Regions:
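Expand to "…catalyze enediolate/carbanion chemistry for C-C bond making/breaking, isomerization
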Residues: 1-101
Length: 101
């Protein structure tokens, strides 16, 4: 994260992918018993998303599921990695899209 601003400003960067497990390993932390990530992990995610938006870089986060897809559609992402069919179904219903999209 120390060079995030400079990295995202490089011409030609089109996408940044973020994953909570990788970020957790970088920090040496793990999810709590309820499956929630520590605040430092979500803060890092939010910072990366903020810089990506500012620089016009697509933000792609792993871990999209049925419980967070609507929030991600409405406020943040363009590219999604679905954890299961439920996430795709909920997202399609929310956006009015039909298969194969």
């Amino acid at each position: 994260l120390e060079v995030l601003d400079q990295t995202m400003a490089v011409p030609g960067i089109g996408m940044v992918e973020w994953g909570p497990a990788d970020m957790s390993m970088s920090y040496g932390v793990a999810r709590d018993p309820n499956g929630n990530y520590p605040k430092m992990v979500t803060d890092a995610r939010n910072r990366i998303l903020e810089v990506a938006k500012r620089e016009g870089v697509v933000f792609s986060a792993v871990g999209t599921n049925g419980s967070n897809i609507i929030d991600r559609i409405d406020r943040e992402q363009i590219l999604f990695h679905f954890a299961n069919e439920e996430a795709a179904r909920v997202g399609r219903r929310h956006t009015g899209r039909v298969m194969p999209y």
